[in-house]
A protein has these predicted regions:
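Long, compositionally biased interface segments
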Residues: 175, 179-253
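Long, low-complexity, intrinsically disordered segments
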Residues: 249-266
């Protein structure tokens, strides 16, 4: 993941309020590109299904050159948030063609009896999304009931962190994610920052639906408009402090930004 030092400083400055708010919610954020570590962290979540193959180093080639992840931990050091993004080179290839070829890496594990004969269809945008494309997945934030991070706006803030870094590092033509229908119906794409949400589904050889996933996406101009707006803030946040940045060897490569929680304000 390549980023000029000046761009990296601008990014951290833009996000310092977001990091401060998350600190006040009791969330320590870690960002990295070691997907063996991500796989290890993800395996701790026994209440979730298997990691998606697109982000699993045992199934896909993914490293600091084409991906990074964001994780969140509570004051006890427990993992309460995950998300990841992967850069795809779809030059001359539509997202529709890509999903047909690599469908096994996007199908929810265990959702269909025959992944070889299951395909995604529906959204017209599948034909127009091409070029430098990012896939945003593995988004999860632990539900903590009323007064928890979700109700305080953490979903939008965590997504904003990933999108800011993604644009700063790669400036993609498009970004997309696949969201279960039950979440799309609740407007999840809006909390993630996306403004396009198209109905889609996975169909088996008999054209029977095995899973209903909405395609949420943004083009470069949508991303620019989103990032031009100030990030959503936690209303109770009062103190703003810049995030601690751990500079790896060989700048301008940025492979770890760590926010250290100073006080847990619940």
């Amino acid at each position: 993941m390549q980023m000029l030092p000046s761009k990296l400083f601008e990014l951290i400055t833009n996000l310092r309020g977001v990091f401060s708010d998350l600190e006040q919610m009791g969330i320590r954020v870690e960002i990295g590109d070691d997907f063996a570590k991500f796989r290890s962290l993800r395996s701790q979540l026994s209440n979730r299904g298997p990691i998606y193959p697109m982000f699993d180093v045992a199934s896909s080639y993914i490293d600091q050159g084409n991906g990074f992840w964001v994780c969140g931990f509570n004051p006890d050091g427990e993992l309460i948030h995950t998300q990841a993004v992967r850069l795809l080179d779809l030059d001359g290839v539509s997202l529709d063609q890509h999903l047909k070829t690599h469908r096994h890496k996007y199908i929810t594990p265990g959702s269909t009896p025959d992944p070889d004969l299951t395909f995604y269809s529906g959204p017209e945008a599948l034909q127009t999304i091409t070029g430098k494309v990012c896939y945003h997945g593995e988004f999860w934030l632990h539900a903590s009931g009323l007064g928890g991070p979700r109700s305080q706006g953490a979903t939008s803030m965590l997504s904003r962190i990933l999108l800011e870094i993604m644009v700063g590092a790669w400036n993609p033509s498009f970004v997309f994610a696949l969201v279960p229908q039950r979440l799309a119906a609740k407007g999840a794409h809006l909390r993630y920052g996306y403004n396009h949400c198209d109905h889609g589904s996975w169909l088996d050889a008999n054209q029977q639906m095995t899973e209903e996933d909405h395609l949420i996406w943004m083009a470069a101009n949508d991303l620019a408009n989103l990032l031009a707006r100030k990030p959503q803030r936690f209303q109770c946040a009062k103190n703003v402090s810049i995030a601690q940045f751990t500079k790896p060897a060989g700048m301008p490569k940025a492979n770890c930004i760590s926010v250290k929680k100073q006080e847990a304000i619940m």
